[in-house]
Amino acid sequence: MSDILDKIIAVKREEIAAALESAPLEELKVQASARDSRDFVGALRDKHAAGHAAVIAEVKKASPSKGVLREHFVPADIARSYAQHGAACLSVLTDERFFQGSARYLEQARAACALPVLRKDFIVDAYQVLEARAMGADAILLIAAALDTPLMIDLEAYAHSLGLAVLVEVHNRSELDEALKLKTPLVGINNRNLRTFETTIDTTLGMLDAIPDDRIVVTESGILSRADVERMEAAGVHTFLVGEAFMRAENPGAELARMFF
């Protein structure tokens, strides 16, 4: 399979160049300054403190590997359903080309509930960090496979200066070593290889021994059943980012409750 991640990053750079023309930095700064902030990390910790799993529930219409996941896709309704059934936070895909996402979907989902929202996209430039704040995100994703360490550190610092939390995502030990140089407590382990899209939840289980106790491990991708959840919880993982299993269900929030509560 061709390297999907490299294709996505190339497209992102084209999108940034175009966006700078249509929405200059100064304009974005004004929009960003008008946004309120919700405590993403705090919402996860509150769930843990109450003895519950902390679920980052994803609003995702499609993916490159699975195609369209949900034909009847109304972000506001999905967000409300998640909030009513115990989600800690939302994750909303804003990538248009590969995931059929949209900044508009993030705005709609956030307006429909009180949950903090992660902008799920492939961030490679500070412009996208500011853009995330301007569209109303409370957190961003930084993917170690897509960024060198100095840039990742700079993007995190900029995000924190804007009041954004950072979820740093890794898939292997070498990426984890670099990710642990960041200040964020949130370390996501993606069970899906972004270069091949192969998925196994053993990826998370095999890396837990290398993560300090002061970090919050977020297991991402491939959590499809109650059995998967129980396996993770038995290993000490209590924070989950789940999309596909919910999106394929008739009622996403009810599926969340069935799997986790």
Curated annotation (Swiss-Prot):
Keywords: Amino-acid biosynthesis, Aromatic amino acid biosynthesis, Decarboxylase, Lyase, Tryptophan biosynthesis. GO terms for biological process: L-tryptophan biosynthetic process. GO terms for molecular function: indole-3-glycerol-phosphate synthase activity; phosphoribosylanthranilate isomerase activity. Pfam families: IGPS (PF00218). The keyword Ribosomal protein does not apply. The keyword Protein biosynthesis does not apply. It catalyses: 1-(2-carboxyphenylamino)-1-deoxy-D-ribulose 5-phosphate + H(+) = (1S,2R)-1-C-(indol-3-yl)glycerol 3-phosphate + CO2 + H2O. The gene is trpC. HAMAP family: IGPS_B (MF_00134_B). Belongs to the TrpC family. It comes from Burkholderia pseudomallei (strain 668). Pathway: Amino-acid biosynthesis; L-tryptophan biosynthesis; L-tryptophan from chorismate: step 4/5. This is Indole-3-glycerol phosphate synthase. Its EC number is 4.1.1.48. CDD domains: IGPS.
